[in-house]
Swiss-Prot record:
Gene: btcB
Cofactor: heme
Species classification: Eukaryota, Fungi, Dikarya, Ascomycota, Pezizomycotina
Pathway linked to the protein: Secondary metabolite biosynthesis; terpenoid biosynthesis
Compartments reported by the entry: Membrane
Glycosylation (residues): N5, N204, N381, N395
PANTHER family assigned to the protein according to its UniProt record, in alphabetical order: CYTOCHROME P450, P450, PUTATIVE (EUROFUNG)-RELATED
Any one cellular-component term (Gene Ontology): membrane
Protein name per its UniProtKB record: Cytochrome P450 monooxygenase btcB
InterPro entries registered for this protein in UniProt: Cyt_P450, Cyt_P450_E_grp-IV, Cyt_P450_sf, Cytochrome_P450_monoxygenase
SUPFAM superfamilies: Cytochrome P450
Top-level taxonomic group: Eukaryota
GO-annotated biological processes: terpenoid biosynthetic process
Organism: Neocamarosporium betae
EC number of this enzyme: 1.-.-.-
């Protein structure tokens, strides 16, 4: 009788999630008492009853979306298996509107209001907070890291502690100190392009930029570059995680049920660090050597260890986890941004010509190019912003949150509901942008100008680095690297895209990350 009290019924008379959970507690006992013949009878009945519940009585039953998505994770698994997640989710929003049900317990929003509600956590409180715990990213964190880091830490106070410890590595003062290291690596990168120009060979510039960013970020992190073989391991594991994404989607669905969810958690925690990723990328011996080296300069680790003077002490595992995470996350986001920006610039040579005019008109020599000067170039920054608007590096299931019970856009989401705010859709929505599907870098140069054709663009809809307490800490570092690489590239070289038949949205895989993007160019040294 207790199961039928008011706590299990919503205000609209429909049962809430507790009723379903009670059924899952009782079901195993019933199954034990059944013989095979009874299972044949009751099995289909249970299946039909479950479908009826999800379609008509579940808390998300009134939210539009594909019927297959409402009753099972198969729709999401199919999209992930097809590696077109961003495009598929946007198609659903185009068809059904700003709020779409994309799984039995998952709802996707495509509004600025939802972006703010979900990612602005209430200080110190659980009520109304949307957490990472129980999401796929949290699940991968349990399987991957020796200790939680600022990407995976779920509780508010624990995350604030780690963020405070890591923050000093990304201060404006540290960025200025780190620039000579960045410039040195870009000079080495340009020597490769010089050789390609002399030999008149085609260059997979995405691959070379990946090597550049890996060397640069690992040097900035630990005072010396990590081996390229570690980058190969990292890329292999990225592909593995994305290949496993359909199965991980099933596991996340199972986590919402008490018995099955508890069993899944037990399996995951019983085999910790399945991928051993941080120790593969940053061996413990390398970390120890870095910490003991007397000549440590302006690397991330020095800044993080320096935070101990403020009373924030990280364990060896926490140092390893956070240091490796900074390299790995920064690597993927920075390379994606560089590759996508060059892709758009070279698809329309006029865009590249306009940017070359700006950069070459501002500087007389490559030596004059520095972080402070290029931060003020409107078209350079507009070219980068526009690429990230159309192809946000952070979009995907990694930005999902789990509701603890709260409202988003006037819709109450009970505890246990997975909430997605789809940046890919928002940043391409005609509701917020003029000419939303077209690469228009000039829209950013005209911000604040009256009577501009882009004056009604809603810039709060542009959040490639997220917002709130979990906004990307390395945002300014990533932008500084991208600006420096592009500015020196367009100043010194003329590039022509060779693989012009490559279409990013059609040919790239999108699930947890963008995979498979490749820009191949012919390089010509700029005439004096």
């Amino acid at each position: 009788m207790d199961a039928m009290n008011g706590s299990d019924v919503q205000s609209d008379g429909l049962p809430n999630g507790n009723t379903l959970q009670l059924a899952y507690h009782v079901m195993p006992r019933l199954v034990q008492d059944m013989g095979p013949s009874l299972l044949l009878i009751f099995g289909p009945l249970v299946l039909v009853s479950s479908c009826i519940y999800y379609l008509f009585f579940h808390p998300l039953s009134k939210i539009p979306g594909p019927k297959l998505a409402a009753i099972s994770p198969v729709w999401m698994m199919k999209s992930l298996y097809g590696k077109k997640l961003n495009r598929d989710i946007k198609a659903l929003h185009d068809r059904y509107g700003d709020v779409v049900r994309v799984g039995p317990n998952t709802v996707s929003f495509a509004t600025v209001g939802a972006l703010s509600s979900v990612h602005h956590e209430k200080a110190g409180g659980d009520d109304g907070t949307f957490t990472k715990e129980g999401t796929i990213e949290w699940l991968l964190g349990l399987m991957t890291w020796p200790a939680q880091n600022i990407l995976t830490k779920t509780d508010v106070k624990g995350h604030a502690r780690l963020r405070k410890a890591v923050q000093p590595a990304f201060s404006a003062k540290e960025l200025r100190k780190q620039e000579p290291i960045e410039q040195e690596w870009i000079t080495k990168f340009n020597r490769l392009l010089d050789a390609a120009a002399v030999d008149n060979t085609e260059v997979n510039i995405t691959e070379h930029m990946s090597h550049l960013v890996w060397d640069m970020l690992s040097d900035l992190s630990f005072g010396e570059p990590l081996a390229r073989s570690q980058l190969v391991k990292f890329n292999r594991l990225k592909w593995l995680a994305c290949a496993m994404s359909p199965m991980l989607e099933v596991m996340q669905s199972i986590l919402t049920f008490p018995i099955a969810g508890a069993f899944t958690r037990w399996i995951v925690t019983s085999f910790p660090q399945v991928f051993q990723l941080p120790r593969d990328i940053l061996p413990t011996g390398t970390l120890r050597t870095t910490l003991e080296r007397a000549d440590r300069g302006h690397d991330f680790l020095s800044a993080i260890v320096g935070a101990q003077e403020k009373g924030i002490v990280l364990s060896q595992d926490e140092l390893q986890s956070n240091s490796a995470m900074l390299v790995m996350v920064g690597q993927d986001a920075t390379v994606t941004c560089l590759s996508s920006t060059l892709y758009f610039l070279l698809r329309d040579p006029q865009h590249m010509a306009n940017l070359q005019d700006e950069v070459r008109g501002q500087f007389k020599s490559e030596d004059e190019i520095n972080g402070l000067a290029i931060a003020r170039l409107p078209l350079l920054n507009g070219s980068i912003n526009e690429a990230m608007r159309l192809l946000s590096p952070a979009n995907g299931t990694g930005t999902h949150r789990l509701s603890n019970g709260g409202f988003v856009e006037g819709i109450y989401l009970p505890a246990g509901i997975t909430v997605a705010v789809d940046q890919y859709t928002i940043q391409r929505s005609p509701k917020y942008w003029r000419d939303p599907e077209t690469y228009r870098p000039e829209r950013w140069a005209s911000v604040g100008e009256p009577e501009s054709e882009f004056e009604n663009d809603v810039h709060s809809a542009y959040r490639p680095f997220l917002l709130g307490p979990r906004a990307c800490l390395g945002r300014e570092l990533a932008l500084q690297i991208v600006r420096l690489v592009l500015a020196r590239l367009v100043f010194s070289y003329d590039l022509r895209m060779v693989n012009r038949d490559f279409v990013w949205e059609r040919d790239c895989d999108s699930s947890y990350l963008w995979l498979g993007h490749k820009v191949v160019v012919k390089v010509q040294k700029r005439e004096s």
